[in-house]
Structure formats: structure tokens, C-alpha cells
Amino acid sequence: MTRFLRYLFLLAMWFVLTADLSAQDTNEFQRIAKRIMDAYDTDNELQHTPDSSHLYGGAYLGASSNGRAMPSAYVTYLKDKLLLTSQLSVDFSELNTEKDVSTSFTSGSDRLTSTNVLTRYEKQDFSTRLDYQPNKGHIFSIGVLESFDHRRVDENTIKNGHEADGTLQESFYEEQRRSNRDLKLGGLMQYICDFERLGRLTTRLNLKYNYKPTTVASDTWAAHSDASLHHQQQTLYNFDPYAMIRLQSKTWNGFKFSLEEKYTLEDMRINDTETTFNYNTRSALSSLSAAYSHRWLALDATFRYEHFVNDIDDHRPTQNTKHYNDWMLTTRATVKWGDKNKFTLSLDRDIQRPTYTQLYPFVHIGSSIGVMVVGNTALAPSKSTQLKGSYTYSGSHWTHTHSLAYKHISDDISQVSSYDEVSQRSVKTWLNDARYRYLRYAAEGEMRYGVFTMTMGFHAQCLDYDGQNVSSDNAWSYSFKARPQIKLPHDWTLATVLLYTGRETHRYYYNQSNLYWSFRAVKQLDSWALYAFVQDILQPDQKQMLTNTDQTTTTLTRPNTRCLIVGCSYTF
């Protein structure tokens, strides 16, 4: 492999190995940027050489009819032993949504809430990375990431209802204004050393810092009562570094292994209007992976052992420091027969730890108007085990995969909601109160005939949930997706997407059936490309049913997502 291709390989490895550093929304431009890199590396042969400036990249500009703008740029500089890559993306959007929430209680009373939500969103991401190879087998890398989000939400609500005896409840009016800024900074330092006979040694230090101030002003009044103004300010500070060392062996007679040690710290502080919450974690994760490959057989397994310390200080007399020692396992076996058939069987055991939001013990205004949230510091991790089998057929015109998975989750962290009659708000918290299991079938395929291609997918799931806040009856979910595409003369490409979701059932709520339809057209003009999207043509209402011990809540959302998106890209 030439030196140039080696640099490209390192760039691709960066996108994979440092996803936590460069975690950004997947958008059209990132797919364009990937095609830029693919143009230089085809079948291990250099198909196109950059010009004498050693500079190449691209830019994308898009805008939608409902008030969204999405400019992005990507540039790479390559010369001798130096590779410099930078990416910048900006997203401005505005969305108006109407929502009706109906709550029926077992006591016989009911509440109706009508809300209009206006959301303004500004997002900016920047990342740059420098790779330097002083000599063969040694690569030094440094990188920085900066991300800034600003979200402003204005909600206006009218609340009505009836008491259990049929009397009309006094109407309540509420206006809520929420503003939060989210600044994330990251830094990466990495060194890779290749040994001729042993393999590759990778060391990495990743630093992340998050600053997120949130301001919420909620003004509530009744038709014949005084107004009540509630003001809340919350600021989050989070420093989250980790250090990693990994040894990857070369392949000997089909065998290879890797050993990794990763140490992570998280130091978080949340200052609210009247409270302070400190959330500190320490983790030591050891991973051992082994793999064997043969002409018709491939085996691999990864064993992980983690010592995890969760230290919570809510400035109360109770002690909330917890120590966990957990093991996780992933195994997979793949059998191939012929050039077209492949069968894979996998077993996975994993841990899901509660988030800081679920642990935060103080009552605060939630992300939705009329909802209060309080965490639970007694939450424990949930454990899951999954067994999955899949079959893949790959032909010249048709590729399809069928999979069947069974998953069992214990000590599930489930959401529980209740209604506070005094504040006229729903109060949401979390409990380790449930076990659930599901059986999931998926079929996915791609059909190719000349200029026509179509990708399709079907998913079905049977869920059995056993929690104190919801019934344990079996519940089915299913969905179907199709994406036909055709290439026309003069470099035109047309595609459409159809998505049908049946009654989509989750652990304690379900969504009604819906049909979504979008259309896309692309025109290629040498280094330019023109894009046009018609998004969410049908724009269906979204209905959700949530069941708890003492109430059933129905939410009807009327989004304003139908729009025309136009854009262009340029690569050099």
C-alpha cells in the first residue's frame, strides 16, 4: 500500500475509533465527504492524484422551506508525512408543533391540555485533526473538537378538565420559555506504533468538557386566580477524560487477538436555583478479544470486565457511593458455504447504567411543558442478554438478510408517571421495577437491475413486559420501509422513501400506525451536485398512548415537518 493510501486508511480509522470525539449528526454532506475520500482509494489502487497544492475537500449548502439552513465544509491537506483534516457544519432551524394531551384517571376525572410549541435551534460543529508520520510504523495524532448548540423553546398551554363527580375544573393557562446553550470541547492525543512481528500498539488520551446552562421561566395562572411565576436556572459542568492502551496482534494461522485497558473519569456538577448535585464516576474496563478465520468459518469473542464507582453527592445525609463489578461478553460465529450464503449466530451480555438525568434527585421542570421530573439515586444498572441468528444471501441482482433475535432484560429502568393535583402537572420518575423480553424478526434486502435499485426492510417484534406500572400483555410492533432509486440520462438520480409503522409498542407506551413518504432528486454537474428533497409529504398526526397505574395519557402531536429542501455541493 502506498504512503498516500496509508494516510487515507489512518483517516478512516480516525472516524471509526474516535467517534466519541467527533460525534456529530449524520447529514448529507458527511456522506458526500465520504465519497470524496472513496474516490482516491478504489481496489487498493490510486485512481486519482490530488493536484500540486495537495489540497482537496468540498462544501455543501442546503436550505428548507420551513426555515432550516445547513451549510457545511470539509477540507484535507496532504503533503509528505503530514495529513491535516478539518470539518465545519452549521444548522439553523425553526419548527412549530401543536400537541393535545388527554389524561384519564381511574378515579373518573380527566384533564385536557392543548399546547403550541415553537422551537428555534442553532447548532455549530467544528473539528480538526493532524496526523504526522515521522517514519514507517510510527504515527502521532492530535485533534480538537468544538460544538455549540443553542435551543430556545416557547410553549403556550391551556388546561381544562372534569373532576370525578363531573364538575368542570377551572381553566389554567401556562406559558413556558426555555433556553439552553450546550458547549462541548474535546481534545485527542494518540500514538500508534507498528511492530514488524507482534502487531500494533495504540495509546490514546481523550479530554472532553461540557458546559450547559439552562433557563426556564414558567408563568401559570387560572381564570379566577392570581398568577404564579416559576423561574428555574440550571447549569451543568462536566469534565470527562479517558485514557486507553490497546495491543492488537498480527494474524497467525488465522488467529489474532487484542488486549485493551481503558480508564475513564467523569466529574459533573449541576447547580440549580436552590440545589447542588455532584455526579462523579470512575471506571476501569479491561477487554480481551480473540478471533479465528478460515475459508468457510469465522469465530470471534470479546470478554469485558469493568470496575465502576458511582459517587453521588446531593448534599443530603444519605450516602450514595456505589461500587459495581460487572462482566460483559460478546461472541459470534459465522459459517459460509459457497460465495453467496452466510449464517451468523451471536450471543451478547451487556449492562445499561442509569444516566445522570435519571439519578438527579431534585424536582425540576422537564423538557415538555406541564411535566415535572425527579430522579432516583437508588437506581441500579439493568442487565440484558441477547441471542441472535441471521442468514445472508448475496447474488448478482439480489441481496437479502433475515435475522431472529431474543432478548431478556432484568432490573429494567422504567419510567413511572403520576399526576399532582396541586400543581396540575405530571410528575415523572424512574424505577428498577420491571423485566421484559422480546422476540424480533427483521428482513432486509437490496435489488439491483441496471439503473434501478431498491432497498427494503421489514421488522416485527413481540414484547412481553412485566412492570408494576403497566400490564404484561404481549404486544406486537411492525414496520416496513422501501427506497426505490433510478438513475436517468444526463446524470439525474431520482429516489423515494416509503415508511409504514404499524402499532409501535414500547415498554410502557405505544404509537399508532403511520405512513411517511419523502422524495429526492440529484443532478450531477462535474464537480457540482444539485439536490432537492420533499420531506414528509403526508405529514401524519402522531398519536401515543401511555399507561400507568392510576392513569392513561393520550398525546396527539401535529408536526409541521412537510417541507422542500434544496442544496448544492462542490468538491475539489
What are these regions (language model features)?
Residues H230-L236, D240-Y242, N376, A380, ...:
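Outer membrane beta-barrel strand-and-loop segments of large Gram-negative receptors
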Residues V101-S109, T157-T167, S218-A227, T273-N278, ...:
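Flexible, surface-exposed loop regions and adjacent strand-edge segments
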Residues H54-G57, E98, Q124-F126, S258-L265, ...:
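Surface-exposed extracellular loop regions of Gram-negative outer-membrane beta-barrel proteins
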Residues F458-Y465, A475-Q524, L538:
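C-terminal beta-barrel architecture of Gram-negative outer-membrane proteins
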Residues L8-V16:
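Bacterial N-terminal signal peptides
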Residues A59-Y60, R111-N116, Q169-R177, S225-Q233, ...:
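Extracellular loop and loop/strand-boundary signature of outer-membrane beta-barrel proteins
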Residues L17-N160, E174-K212, Y237-F239, I245-L259, ...:
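Membrane-proximal, glycine/serine-rich, low-complexity loop/turn segments characteristic
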